[in-house]
Swiss-Prot record:
Belongs to the metallothionein superfamily. Type 15 family. The lineage of its organism: Eukaryota, Viridiplantae, Streptophyta, Embryophyta, Tracheophyta. InterPro entries: Metalthion_15p. It comes from Brassica juncea (Indian mustard). This is Metallothionein-like protein type 2, MT2-28. One of its GO terms (molecular function) is metal ion binding. Keywords: Metal-binding, Metal-thiolate cluster. Metallothioneins have a high content of cysteine residues that bind various heavy metals. The keyword Metal-binding applies.
Length: 80
């Protein structure tokens, strides 16, 4: 029988935790609470004319590639 009906959450170090499934931020789980965030913009800068070159680099957050198998063991780290 699988833990959480096969919907295990992957935490740090590709270890399965909780029942939240594979999330973008694997160490965070749903707690049923809501949070309100406010953003205040204090000023604006003038537009700048610049050219940027694409560097071709790709950044991946650490431990966000876990995939949990049906027995709540990470089965390879491939969930993104």
């Amino acid at each position: 029988m699988s833990c959480c009906g096969g919907n295990c959450g992957c935490g740090a170090g590709c270890k399965c935790v909780g029942c939240g499934g594979c999330k973008m931020y694997p160490d965070l789980s749903f707690s049923g609470e809501t949070t309100t965030t406010e953003t205040l913009v204090l000023g604006l800068a003038p537009a700048m004319n610049s050219q940027f070159e694409a560097s071709g680099e790709t950044f991946v957050a650490e431990n966000d590639a876990c995939k949990c198998g049906s027995d709540c063991k990470c089965n390879p780290c491939t969930c993104k």
